[in-house]
Amino acid sequence: MNHLKRQDEKVFAAIEAELGRQRSKIELIASENFVSEAVMEAQGSVLTNKYAEGYPGKRYYGGCEHVDVVEDIARDRAKEIFGAEHVNVQPHSGAQANMAVYFTILEQGDTVLGMNLSHGGHLTHGSPVNFSGVQYNFVEYGVDAESHRINYDDVLAKAKEHKPKLIVAGASAYPRVIDFKRFREIADEVGAYFMVDMAHIAGLVAAGLHPNPVPHAHFVTTTTHKTLRGPRGGMILCEEQFAKQIDKSIFPGIQGGPLMHVIAAKAVAFGETLQDEFKTYAQHIINNANRLAEGLQKEGLTLVSGGTDNHLILIDVRNLEITGKVAEHVLDEVGITVNKNTIPFETASPFVTSGVRIGTAAVTSRGFGLEEMDEIAALIAYTLKNHENEVALEEASKRVEALTSKFSMYTDL
């Protein structure tokens, strides 16, 4: 980054500081990951200069012959990975991918069935502070009070009662496998469309380690980062019958020119996903999550639903007599990055919360294995149990430093 250093020392310094943070801390935010150098090179390429409104072969600008190739590569690879009939790789985010699906099939005020945010859903699945909850009549379903797993009988009952035009499955904080086949059966029974937001589990689906929603859903949306380990962005997969409508909803519906440098990075990431090594990586994500969950439970911590089937773990910190906000802060102090998170049947404010969400995608990318999961579990428990003990926190910080120093990353930067 010599050019940047000469041109803008302040921005360069901030980026260098962030690189230092990523190297020195244990990254456990479930929605974050570390992309390859190849993905970063594509995203930082000359494609950032090119406007390309429209789609390959039908652009509103000249000079698009090379970016057309890139977008076709991204679309074709995504189709191959997930077995989709049609793919749109232009959404700038998962939220915009969801918006495009809603705009394709819904009218303002239509009824939609979506997962309660505090039970693990997402803002764009009907939260009243989000456009989805403002534009549409979302009815919430959630998890069972005892098992903390989706109550499919409740989903069916609410679908029969409210007759939604669309049912949305998928979550941002649900650590268990979702039965997409059951959801589609419910949707068919009430004559609803079925959409899956697989943003968190897309990489696991790609590796064949989580049921694929594509054969069951009319529409599937995802981000391209998280477990998929690509650049920050979105994508829509759908049946061919909806292809033209979806494409029109993205452009000119809610977006203008696509970010061709990001689409190039998506293409590179999808190419990585198609390699055998990616399946091994995804299996390590799950193995690490299970080991970490077991370690946390051995330390006496309470996990929502009692464990995990994917990359994600949700810790209920109430028995430690602290809040999610305090837990996030004290863990960050010792070098462990997490996020506070609501838990099912939450009573605290979203700014305070009773839980902490963690995930293993980023640490697995860094090379952490089962032994490191044991140490991380011990560190999390030790830190939270001693959150007011400065001596203990200093010891935890040194243990984090000792652990991260064994795993180099981005050595060429």
Curated annotation (Swiss-Prot):
Main location: cytoplasm
InterPro entries: PyrdxlP-dep_Trfase (IPR015424), PyrdxlP-dep_Trfase_major (IPR015421), PyrdxlP-dep_Trfase_small (IPR015422), Ser_HO-MeTrfase (IPR001085), Ser_HO-MeTrfase-like (IPR049943), Ser_HO-MeTrfase_PLP_BS (IPR019798), SHMT-like_dom (IPR039429)
Catalytic activities: (6R)-5,10-methylene-5,6,7,8-tetrahydrofolate + glycine + H2O = (6S)-5,6,7,8-tetrahydrofolate + L-serine
Domain of life: Bacteria
Main EC class the enzyme belongs to: transferase
CDD domains: SHMT (cd00378)
UniProt xrefs under PROSITE patterns: SHMT
Sequence positions bearing N6-(pyridoxal phosphate)lysine: K226
Site, as annotated: Plays an important role in substrate specificity: H225
Amino acids binding (6S)-5,6,7,8-tetrahydrofolate: L117, G121, H122, L123, E239, S349, P350, F351
Zinc in keyword set: no
Record bears the keyword RNA-binding: no
Cofactor list: pyridoxal 5'-phosphate
Pathway note: One-carbon metabolism; tetrahydrofolate interconversion; Amino-acid biosynthesis; glycine biosynthesis; glycine from L-serine: step 1/1
An example Gene Ontology biological process: glycine biosynthetic process from serine
Function statement: Catalyzes the reversible interconversion of serine and glycine with tetrahydrofolate (THF) serving as the one-carbon carrier. This reaction serves as the major source of one-carbon groups required for the biosynthesis of purines, thymidylate, methionine, and other important biomolecules. Also exhibits THF-independent aldolase activity toward beta-hydroxyamino acids, producing glycine and aldehydes, via a retro-aldol mechanism.
Classification via HAMAP family: SHMT
NCBIfam families: PRK00011.1
Recorded family membership: Belongs to the SHMT family.
Subunit-level organization: Homodimer.
Record protein name field: Serine hydroxymethyltransferase
